Each structure stands twice: as C-alpha cells, then as structure tokens.
Amino acid sequence: MIKALLIGDVIGRPGRAIVERFVPSLREELGIDLVVINCENAAAGLGVTPSVADELFRAGADVLTSGNHVWKKKEALELLKLDPRVLRPANYPADAPGSGTAIIETLSGFKVGILNVQGRVFMEPTTDCPFRCAAREIERLRMTTPMIIVDVHAEATSEKVALGWFLDGKVSCVFGTHTHIPTADERILPKGTAFLTDTGMTGPTYSVIGVKKEMVIEKFLQQTPRRFEMASGPAVLQGAIVEIDPSSGKATGIRRVQIHGSGF
C-alpha cells in the first residue's frame, strides 16, 4: 500500500511556509510515500518561479502540478522546460513549454504516474478537451504503472465530477484544484478510483480565496476595478491523503486533510 498526500493550491509565502512546517512531519508520522502539490499560485499569489519550486521540493514535494496561472511568471517557461517534476496541464498545445505528465518513483521503489489537465468550462484560455486528452495520456502511462493520480484544474464542479466518472477504473485518484474551496465529497467510485472535487487551498486563513478580504468586499460593494493583494497572517494547509494498492492501482481509502498554523 502506498500513501499519497495531495495538497491544494499553495498561495504565496504563507502557503509555502505552512507546507515547510508540516509536510516533513506528515511524511514521517503518516508514512507518506508521495507528495503532490499544486503550485500555480505559489509565487506571490500568481505563478511559480524556480526558487519557489525549489522551496516546495525541499519541503517534501515530489511533483508540482499547476493550471491556467502557471504562465504568470516568465521564469516559469524555462522551469517547465528544464524540470520534468513541474507540470503544466497536458491539454495545452503540444508545443507549449513543459509536459502534463510525469512518472515519479517513490522511496519504496513504486512508480506512480501523475497527470495534470485543465477544464474548459468558465476557464481561460480554452484548451483541448480534457476528457480525450486524459484518456490518451492515461493509456500511455499505464504502459509503465497501474498507479495514476490526476489533478483536474477546473472551475466547474460538474466538469470535475464528470471527469471523475469518466476515469473511474482507469486511474487511482482524481482530485480537483483551482477554486481554493475544499469540497466534502471524498469517496471511492465503484471501479476503484478515489475522487475529491476540490482539495481547497494552502494559504492565508483570513482571506477570500487567498486575497485580502477587505479588497474583495470593497470590490463587491463598489463594483469598480481593484488590484488585489495577497493576504497574510495565519495559514491553513488543505488537501487529501489517498491510499493505493500498488498491484491493482485501485484506491483503498481517501480522507481530507486540514491543518491550521500561525506565525507566518
């Protein structure tokens, strides 16, 4: 049995700090074999840079997934080209920098496939079909390992749920990112795929999805353009732990994780 820790969108320095504080102890105390972190907001709230990625890897990440905001920092273009552990959604054009899949070998010697796709409903830019892309990439990954974890970076709950059912029995786990709000629907689907619509965010607790709450409230009240700033203060780490049978690739358990911390 292997255990994978899946961490929702890391938001800026508060998110990175709480990852650094708790992920090493979680790995040790719970016997975590693999850590997957969505990094698309990890650099000052938007995008990722080489130094930020390195910080997350040193804190215990094995692979970094992303989404539509991964392109916000120009440094990410070279990072995606050079580091196969940093993923962009696989359903971007083939000549976009980087890759949407990776195969990670755990310390215990098991290989796990990671796939990152982006939804199309209410999302920009428009990408290729995540369903067809996922089916194609999974067929290729299964030639190496039956254990596959999919990060679906999408806005619409319905699209993520539909992808979960579409991939049931084909992958070990489908988990959602992007909305920064965790859902309470973790379950194992009938054919053995663990599913969670959204893992939430890892970032400032007293915020509106990572942004200073006063700015967002003012925006709603005045309906005028605002340049948002990332919040600070206490932070929360949100995600899930999934257990997978290495021989079959089927999930045997999934549970949500939420840890609060302060002093960041």
Locate each region found by the language model.
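Acidic, metal/ion-coordinating pockets
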Residues: M1-F264
